[in-house]
């Protein structure tokens, strides 16, 4: 419609003005129009508070964060904050902050979930919410996002067959930042992922530990070279729903815990709940990816001592091994695992 075209022109003009001011604008839209509009800029100046001043340092300011009402309460808000935190991580600046009035309770709850804390009120009466890379709260994977706890207990592999992997992680081969835009701004495929498996042995990792996502190639020859690590996550929940044929929770409880984060539909989940001997649910927060040309294959893992004779999902990886694999995947480890 003419109205929509005019609206899009206004948005483009706004982007142009923001760019001229040295800002970055991030946008998500769908068939109904604008879904989210986020604007960030770099600063190095004091922040005046009622009763004090925050000294100048290198900061990213979220100057605008608007999410359409139809998306509030959905995963878009979580994804939008995640995307901004990735941008902040890449910038290398000390802090990121945003201002919000107390009545913006939904936004504030999301900020606090991701580790922002209120430093005080500015002179306009807005709360100033800050996150610093020098004071990361590692008590919770959301609060520490996108930084991994340097003192994690152990890591390991999550083995996912290629078909399911490409549904859960459809962006693992995309170039540049298109991946993070796609994952953060897709309501149905947000930052949190759920794996439903039939494992019964104790896992080598726990909640709060990082894991490496291994895409198992299942068709044709060359599995040693085509099966590979594509991404890394941090575990947020481990739920044993069924053990040795014994149901440990009702199917309705299982559905409630999984929500809309599984690649399986309700009927497929019911089949697994009924017929699998064991049922294990691993919920994880997506922290990063290696990207096209950087995926680490089984051959390299084996030649470097990170594979073995046991089932791969049970192989424990210490901090040195985990960092080595990230480095092979062309990840700047010093900007992902920080003290």
What are these regions (language model features)?
Residues 201-220:
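Short coil-to-beta transition motif at edge beta-strands of beta-rich domains
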Residues 31-64:
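Conserved acyl-donor/pantetheine-binding loop and adjacent beta-alpha core of acyl/acetyltransferases
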Residues 186-197:
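Short, structured beta-strand/loop micro-motifs enriched in basic residues and often containing a Trp
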Residues 67, 73-87:
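Conserved acetyl-CoA-binding loop-helix of GNAT-fold acetyltransferases
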Residues 1-11:
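Single conserved hydrophobic/aromatic residue that forms the stacking wall/gate
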Residues 87, 94, 98, 106-187, ...:
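Contiguous surface segments at macromolecular interaction interfaces
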Residues 221-234:
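Short coil-to-beta-strand transition motifs
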Residues 24-30, 96:
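Cytosolic beta-strand hydrophobic patch enriched in CBS
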